[in-house]
A protein has these predicted regions:
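Structural helix-adjacent loops and short alpha-helical linkers that scaffold large soluble proteins
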Residues: 7-9, 104
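Catalytic nucleophile-loop/oxyanion-hole region of alpha/beta-hydrolase
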Residues: 29-45
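Catalytic-core regions built around general acid/base machinery
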Residues: 1-7, 195-198
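Aromatic-lined carbohydrate-binding surfaces of glycoside hydrolases
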Residues: 2, 10-31
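Chitinase-like catalytic core of GlcNAc-active glycosidases
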Residues: 3, 18-20, 45-51
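Extracellular glycoside hydrolase catalytic/binding regions
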Residues: 40-68, 72-205, 209, 213, ...
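Histidine- and aromatic-rich ligand-binding microenvironments
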Residues: 6, 15, 58
Length: 243
């Protein structure tokens, strides 16, 4: 995949794709609505494993200039908490450790994540990462902003305000009208269009997630792995408009 991206003039993001709080493991609920006997997803979130991963991967791909390194997919507290105890101050030392690990092997762009499933960068200005080639990331979905909040104000509070000081990329966004995951449940008109219009106003890059059928959410494909659903068609149209 890395070589294919290079051959086609594309960037490639390598993500340490775990969810949870460093220092243990994280288990999601099993989901038999997706597939029969669908197992729970277990993420082993030990920091030593993350360091070992980046020592290996950054050393292997660190000289390929089209490769970006996303240090940790979604730092978060436990499923049964509000994540309020897992804030920027708690997460930042681990994030900085992983940044420093990648830097031993590469000068490429690093994508730095924040707490609450990479949805909240509000505390970054109080103690930002130390690095000279870093972009902050946010993962934003239809219900990242609570129903009690104004949608645009919620985006501005979580990541938009930071763009006047630091580079930011939305490395995950998407929607699924009817999926099990409440966080990703939304529509093109209610979420995707206003969200991408907001990103255009901020001149922010984005990566839609995920090019996959419905056993992962939010999917862009139907179960035949070929047919685009509402989300997939929306992304395709926006990419065509940008050409």
């Amino acid at each position: 995949m890395i070589d294919m991206a290079e051959e086609n003039g594309l960037y490639a993001i390598i993500s340490y794709h775990v969810i949870g709080r460093p220092g243990g493991w994280y288990e999601s609920d099993s989901d038999t609505t997706m597939l029969p006997n669908y197992p729970a997803k277990v993420h082993y979130t030990d920091s030593d494993m993350a360091v070992a991963f980046w020592n290996k991967v950054a050393a292997r791909y660190g000289q390929k200039k089209h490769v970006l390194f996303e240090i940790y997919n979604e730092p978060a507290g436990k499923l049964d908490s509000t994540n309020d105890d897992f804030n920027w101050a708690v997460w930042r030392p681990t994030g900085q450790l992983l940044i420093d690990t990648v830097r031993k092997h590469s000068n490429n762009i690093i994508l730095g994540s924040g707490p609450k499933y990479s949805s909240d960068l509000s505390e970054v200005p109080s103690n930002p990462y130390i690095d000279t080639n870093l972009v902050y990331v946010a993962h934003i979905y239809p219900n990242t902003v609570t129903k009690e909040e104004d949608q645009v104000a919620g985006w501005e509070k979580r990541f938009g305000f930071l763009t006047s000081t630091y580079p930011v990329i939305i490395s995950e966004w998407g929607f699924h009208d009817g999926g099990k995951d409440e966080t990703t449940r939304g529509t093109a008109e209610g979420f995707a269009k206003p969200f991408l219009d907001y990103l255009d106003q901020k001149n922010l890059p984005w990566v839609a997630y995920v090019y996959h059928p419905p056993d992962d959410e939010p999917p862009m494909l139907e179960r035949d792995w070929v047919t685009l659903n509402e989300f997939g068609l929306f992304v395709k149209k926006r990419l065509e408009m940008a050409q």
